[in-house]
């Protein structure tokens, strides 16, 4: 495994989904941070500069789309890949997420293999 594991920020307000994503990612050797609050997600991204952000679209207070737009608007976070992970499954939801600055879109319930393929397309698990 890599000496310096990649860090993934999970922005999700559903505790069951957080636990599932965290377990899958940590089982694959990634470090995780998590929050269910949009403003805290922005602050964590600025303070920790994760290698990838998994963004729920439907958050309390501030939507994941707004969080994504704010992260894209700041030099400290604009290059961090962001993957929308959401129960919204209509085609226009995906377009809206991508237009807001997300790099990819994964629908819930997730397929573990498809989810990991998406994550690993942005973050190789092992360093060469």
Feature-to-residue mapping (PLM):
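Active-site beta3 strand of CheY-like receiver
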Residues: 48-54, 59
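The feature encodes the CheY-like receiver
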Residues: 60, 78, 90
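Charged docking surfaces used in two-component/phosphorelay signaling
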Residues: 19-27
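Short hydrophobic/Thr-rich beta-strand motif most characteristic of the beta2 strand and flanking loop
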Residues: 29-36, 44
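C-terminal output helix
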Residues: 16, 110-120
């Amino acid at each position: 495994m890599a000496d310096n594991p990649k860090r993934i920020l999970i922005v999700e307000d559903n505790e069951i989904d957080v636990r599932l994503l965290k377990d899958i990612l940590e089982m694959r050797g990634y470090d995780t941070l998590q929050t269910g609050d949009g403003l805290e997600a922005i602050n964590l991204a600025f303070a920790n500069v994760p290698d990838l952000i998994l963004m729920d679209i439907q958050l309390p207070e501030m939507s994941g789309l707004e969080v994504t737009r704010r992260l894209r608007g700041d030099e400290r976070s604009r290059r961090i890949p962001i993957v929308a992970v959401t129960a919204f499954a209509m085609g226009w939801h995906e377009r809206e997420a991508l237009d807001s600055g997300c790099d990819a879109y994964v629908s819930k319930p997730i397929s573990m293999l498809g989810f990991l393929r998406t994550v690993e397309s942005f973050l190789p698990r092992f360093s060469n």
